[in-house]
Amino acid sequence: MSASIPASTFASTPASSTYIGRFAPSPTGPLHLGSLVAAMASYLDARTHHGTWQVRIEDVDGDRNVPGADRHILGSLQRAGMLWDGDATWQSQRGIVYQSAIDYLGEHVYPCGCSRKDIADAQHRLSPKQAQALVYPGTCRHGLPPGRAARALRLRVPQPRHTIAFVDRWYGLVEQDLSDEAGDFVVKRADGFWAYQLAVVADDGAQGITDIVRGADLLDSTPRQIYLQQLLGLRQPRYLHVPVVLNERGEKLSKQTGAAAFDNGASVEQLLATALLPAARWLGMDVRAASIAEFWRAALPAWDRLMLEHRVPGR
């Protein structure tokens, strides 16, 4: 493809010596211990690399947003001592970036008229592995079936095999056959909202993000994002996925599993005892502190030591 992404939409990728990280929470409620762990890891990695740390509110899914949650999140980060560089950004204000990405992708994107029921009904034609992964069967890949109107936009994944491999700084080599494990995936949803995979890649590219540190629950999404980066001509960031926090039932700690806000007006002492210190321990750091400033002074070298333990060859 000879066309280029407009310079006004996507920033040029900075030199690899310039570290630019980010924390990108969804405003579906206040931050809890699980999201604090992800924020802490990304913040510490940026600061130990003498880089910048940005905050992006991923409010592209309007149906799930909780009014005021974005401001609560920003306030919680400040109370915890995690101050970001520059201005926070909101995905809901960046639709032009996502539309520019769709335009650039051109024929790699096609309209899909399938409902969830249509896809479920077609699962029996797939291999057991694809059916279990809910891989899209390609019903609309070569055109909409008669009488079926377009609902969403999907990205074509090369067939029959297309393996994406990358080295994660925590988990090492990760490989995924997109055609077999993901299939053609949605980039714009039937409800009109931009899909997460497209929005996050477009924003990371436009903001020049060089390093992505986040929870391991997003490890499976990374190959799709790398494929989008390749199609959009964006440099691939370095990735570090940290283990997600689990509750006493072994479930990922989340709002859906009853996770409580870590910042509910607690005192500094309570914030340390119930949030910052437990988050550091979950990541594998032995940090002792009596104040928030003291915590971060101790956490920086502790993170360096932790990363030495998890150093992956070539990273």
Where are these regions (language model features)?
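N-terminal Rossmann-like or analogous alpha/beta NTP/dinucleotide-binding catalytic cores
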Residues: 2-6, 10-127, 216-234, 287-294
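Catalytic adenosine-cofactor/nucleotide-binding cores of aminoacyl-tRNA synthetases and other
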Residues: 115, 124-125, 220-221, 231-315
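Structural motif
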Residues: 31, 191-193, 265-271
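Active-site neighborhoods of enzyme catalytic cores
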Residues: 68-174, 181, 292-299, 303-315
